[in-house]
């Protein structure tokens, strides 16, 4: 972007990466070909975005950053492709726990800020049933309304600042519901979701008002999804990574 490029120092080689087509043969970006998005270096295709071990546009940019960092070391393309396909992401960071009747169940419990949740939503192409809320730490939730309107079928809210988040959604006509527990919110989201959708825990808040930490919150979410699947006689096909 223009701001970061303005900080270039004279005499230093600069390699850029971004979510658009690269400006030079040495830069990394994303190109569209035959309705398929590819990670590229200049005009050289590195990998189709769909083959990344983790999903979301934000993770595609993370992959591009890693490619740019390894460029000076002449890492073979085949080795890069293997790693990009096999890396399944970090726990609680847009992690695909599994699927239930074609509905992806995604744990993004580490998303404790509006910015983090916005990245998760903007990076997804699936219809999203978002579960959010908790201790907002005094954040302004205004930015969440617009992106939820574009990305979410509904937003299910829990925790101390649920009403504050709801207030940011109302001007955009976003459907939302308030719940007393994460278990209830998870069950309701799974009831509404259909094959091809995703139920996403991305709270935009800290967990301390209801849970020991974000790890505990993630475990409650996973257990709730598994319990709902069992109660409805459906398999919870466990997977790692995110798609």
Language model: regions and residue ranges:
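Acidic, Mg2+-coordinating active-site environments of NTP-dependent enzymes
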Residues: 1-103, 166, 233-236
